[in-house]
Amino acid sequence: MDGIGTLRNLKEISEKSNLSKELIKILRNIKIKPVLTAHPTQFYPGSVLGIITDLSKAINDNNLIEIKKLLSQLGKTPFFKKKKPSPFDEAVSLTWYLENVFYNSISNIQKYIKSNIADFDFKNSDLVSLGFWPGGDRDGNPYVTNEITIKTALKLRSDIIKNYYRDVSKLRRRLTFKNVEEVIIDIENRLYKSFNQNTDQTSISLDELKEKLNFIKEEVSQNHESLYMDEINELIDKINIFGYHFASLDIRQDSSIHNDVFEKILLQVFDKKTSHNYKTLSDDEKILLIKSKKLSNNTLNFTDSQVLSTLGSIDAMRSIQKSNGEKGCHRYIISHNQSALNILEVHKMFEITGWINPSVDIVPLFETIQDLKHSVSIMEKVYNNSIYKNHLENRNNEQIVMLGFSDGTKDGGYLTANWNILKSKEQLIDISSKYGIKLKFFDGRGGPPARGGGNTHQFYSSMAGIIDTTDIQLTIQGQTISSNFGTIDSCQYNLEQLISSACNNQNLSDSFSHLSDDNRKTMDRLSEYSFKAYNDFKNHPMFLSYLEKMSTIKYYAKTNIGSRPSKRKSSSDVFEIETLRAIPFVGGWSQLKQNVPGFFGLGSSINFFHENNEFNKVEKLYKEMPFFRTLLSNSMMSLQKSFFDLTHYLKDDKDFSEIWNIIYSEYNLTKQMILKLSGFKKLMENEPANKASINKREEIILPLFTIQQFALQKLNKLRLEENPAKNKIKVCEKLITRSLFGSINACLLYTSPSPRDLSTSRMPSSA
């Protein structure tokens, strides 16, 4: 791999600066953990994934005949699903990437470090590890059962053992030596039996597998001239990295579910009066109540399905740790964590199931702007709780906190969400340090900038001097998996980018953010003005109506690309932004080609400084703070993907002209302000490869968006008729759904820039 942000580039930089030993030391401590999620922004059938793989190989081989055949096959292969996938279907779809891509890419990274940067004694099996949500993420998805969770974990174990079996089979043909051949044959046979076993035990345990391979290594080294030692070491490294778990399956559930469960549990423990009052008690009273009573499901005999399912998810975690090892399932994530009680309720659930001192990390997820602001006081409260303090001691005094970019942006706008997340990280580190807790962050980032995405390497590099990034954990969602991690080369390249950004933040780079008091005040003011502009826009009387009638939000569920409902559970069928998930919210604006969540409020906030003769303060911020430059750079991407000609007909619409013009004005203002700050003449002029990729994609999918808008207009007119023709309504809805599915999967239709091309794109250090 060549180019900026690769390991080779990192090696060259460290050598020039006489920091080679420092780099090795840093690489021994870095941990990168991409977590694959099945968020419904893309869902390719296995047949399509196979074609993509073959097509990639044909392109590399310059085999024009094969390319033409495969493109024809792709054109005739159905992308859409007649019915929604099950959570297990989603898991199977993503394990394809684990088995065929990540397994090789992560191994290649370890090989490169050992042969080019460090030596063969280099040890850091956690340098790149994997997380996995399909089959474990229950938040808003009633179709994820405990049976599916266990089935998914066994699938992960089966797939990794299958990969080991393939590698051992190749080795067996080479290791035909005395005292070695019979051992490798025994390993091969027992691995073959193991990958079809659906029980806790396997024909060969992980410890025994390692022991036998180390015996082979020693024997070959001592008696057989170290023949094929590289291949033996590579397999041992893979086993140390992936174990029998392949990827760690996370459990996630909404805090409101836990609250309901506890009310039902207490109904059985105390008298009905106490239970019915549980929701009316203060948080402190609830904490005292659940602390005062020892609870066990062995004595309570729960019958409520919600209680059984929730407690059963903990039993499933215990079962998975038994079959796949502790790393197989060791994190319980609490969505919409709003209080210390939310964390302590989950900890209590482990006690109820009889799992005392659980080998599990309880992970609060803070999402809204208010939750982010309260996160510090929440964590201080649990750090002071004696029971939770004991739990943390059993977890090496380490706490993971997850921060949600998608819902934060939906709630407070692009600039405010990103700035509040950064400030929360700083404050959470301080409070954790005060109590002797090592804090790790897990970033819930989506693909587009509006959901925390954009240039991930720039994002983490921009943290230098502000946040420690030796441990990077982030979600990889939807189309980002296939576009950035879909092939071995692109996967390795993007993983190296993450490693590089982490290393650069450990004194290997002079690009540090200078968060002086003046710059902080400027950021706070920008955030304040941006939030006001975004909030005023959200409160516009036509905001919800515009989204409901003129976007494709309501049709996301009909594409059948994900098992999870597009809305959170609600007591009403009324269109509400509170119950709307971030993915269809951002997706709706994207399909409108307006990308509001990726820029709205940014232009207004910068312009406030401009109009008040304080633009020099923003210029200073842009020059001195890489984090701010990264925000603007990613916002440029949102602006570049916008195309207001598509909806220009709404400019004079009797219902939506005002709100359309508000959006268009903010778009133009943001573009004007960003260009003025950056010194660019055009958006993304510093990223020609990325810009060309975006433009090609937009060129291909614009007809689909045009069809959508035509069908939406037609549908709105039909519904105004006294007796609308049902068949015409059905045709329009089908047009919208089909075109939506095509545009969601559009990244299949163009070749993304290669790692080499992307490495030439740079972010300016200042205007």
What residue ranges belong to the model's regions?
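Often metal-dependent polyanion-binding catalytic scaffolds in large enzymes
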Residues: 1-287, 306-309, 330, 360, ...
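Conserved small/polar residues in nucleotide/adenosyl-binding loops
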Residues: 750-757, 767
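Conserved mid-sequence domains
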Residues: 276-369, 374
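Acidic, glycine-enriched catalytic cores built around paired aspartates
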Residues: 245, 250-252, 257-259, 274-302, ...
